[in-house]
């Protein structure tokens, strides 16, 4: 059974393997053992309530409960930008007009922004290519909503998610090549690595402070503003079906879109509910895939089951109960996996 659980120190080797498969562009999962070890330590200190809000971040892994193999990672930052500034470009408009000359130009413009400061962030979503089947991607992404619903007071009103922008297999980013490289004087991969390993001071020091007309960028760069990497398109679709929207904020490095939603408007959070769990053999029937999660903060578990999403009493097998770290009589959180049926 595939389950979501909190990260542990022993996961470092598995995370290094995952980091090596990202192909670059996933800033928060660099192939750097010291950085990943520090990330694990920060997550564990978050669970033990040892950190201020601006440093808190939860990390989860997707594990095969029978073999112990890890095939995916996902994370939540509690409040971004409270320690280091959190930058986006806001894609806006500047108008230049002259009645005398009968000229009117509305020009798309990039404005440096810290508007999402304090928001909670969904981040570091990566699934091993060999695990991209049987609903694993949905479980990995949406399990975070079950955790947020259970421990709502830990998170802020707005939730954001930076989506990976357009980068080719050689690490070439059209947006970076046309804009960022002119100010940072380094390749995209170098800037991405520095940011991913926590060396972010250079961003504030070298970022252009004035609005930038997108017409000054190459046509290739203009075309990728707000667009996602092909491998990220499914993740974007998942979030949009949960209520997330693109509000014209983009990543300063690759131009990928930032999606956002009020936390209480996220479908899986809004519609999830607590039901009593019993041990037994689930009744046969053509039931939809559902997310189920325990309410244990330190030993959180989430998985997929076939069930009636409207049931008041969820029957699970002994193996399912064991994987979810719960017992008969406990209450678990349940919600339909998708607004529309998704076969897994």
Swiss-Prot record:
Annotated GO biological process: arginine catabolic process to glutamate; arginine catabolic process to succinate
InterPro entries listed in its UniProt record: Acyl_CoA_acyltransferase, Arg_succinylTrfase_AstA/AruG, Arginine_N-succinylTrfase
EC number: 2.3.1.109
Gene Ontology MF, one: arginine N-succinyltransferase activity
UniProt catalytic activity: succinyl-CoA + L-arginine = N(2)-succinyl-L-arginine + CoA + H(+)
Domain of life where this protein originates: Bacteria
SUPFAM superfamilies in UniProt: Acyl-CoA N-acyltransferases (Nat) (SSF55729)
Annotated catalytic residues: 229 (proton donor)
Keywords: Acyltransferase, Arginine metabolism, Transferase
Binding annotation for succinyl-CoA: 125
Coiled coil ranges: none
Keyword RNA-binding listed: no
Claim: Transferase is one of the keywords in the record: yes
The protein's annotated pathway: Amino-acid degradation; L-arginine degradation via AST pathway; L-glutamate and succinate from L-arginine: step 1/5
Entry-linked PANTHER family: ARGININE N-SUCCINYLTRANSFERASE, N-SUCCINYLARGININE DIHYDROLASE
Family label: Belongs to the arginine N-succinyltransferase family.
Cross-referenced HAMAP family: AstA
Protein function: Catalyzes the transfer of succinyl-CoA to arginine to produce N(2)-succinylarginine.
Protein name: Arginine N-succinyltransferase
Gene this chain is encoded by: astA
